[in-house]
Amino acid sequence: KQVQTPGGMWYTPVSGIWQTVWLESVPDRYIRRVDFCCTLEEAVLDVGDESLSGTVTVACPEGPFIAPLEGGRAVLRPANPRPWSPEDPFLYPVTIQAGEDRVESYFALRTLEIKTAGGRPRLCLNGAPYYFHGVLDQGYWSDGIFTPASPAAYEEDILAMKALGFNTLRKHIKVEPPLFYYACDRLGMAVFQDMVNNGDYRYLRDTVLPTLGFQTR
């Protein structure tokens, strides 16, 4: 939503490095990514390379357990699954060892789906209807525009919203650095992530036609 002539809902353009940048030395075969697909009982890990094998150590309250990493994937099943929610933001720390590479990460057990409850479709968290009470978060900072002065600023904003009774942030047309989402996961804040803008805007095409319909009584 950045234009050369800002006005209305269009913003002043900015530029520069606003995401995390780093240099990393890795072995020839390394863990390219860490993706989790979770249910309320298990998490399936994908490291992005089918040739990798190794181990995954999961920290649990009852003690750690080790699962094999085979074909770049691992199935992680805690003995006593504890679901994540804004009221109980429980995370499972994991250590992934594959060859000479080692990565530390985490996952949470959570489901989000639409189910019929009380005769109406409801947005459900972990199988039960849940009221997501949120605010719009545009990700601007008075001292850094798109970048906060410190990662601690993320936590301050999240905790301030929780203190006001909110459990959800709608991140508006901006993808934040991973530290923001980690803070939300750890502190118990749901995130509704907007897609970024990818073109021009036409009121008839983009607002009227997609919502045009007929109602009968």
Task: For the regions a language model picked out, list residue spans one by one.
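Solvent-exposed loop/turn segments at secondary-structure junctions
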Residues: 175-176, 197-200
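Active-site-adjacent "subsite" loops/lids of carbohydrate-active enzymes
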Residues: 133, 199-217
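Secreted/periplasmic carbohydrate-active enzymes, especially glycoside hydrolases
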Residues: 1-191, 217
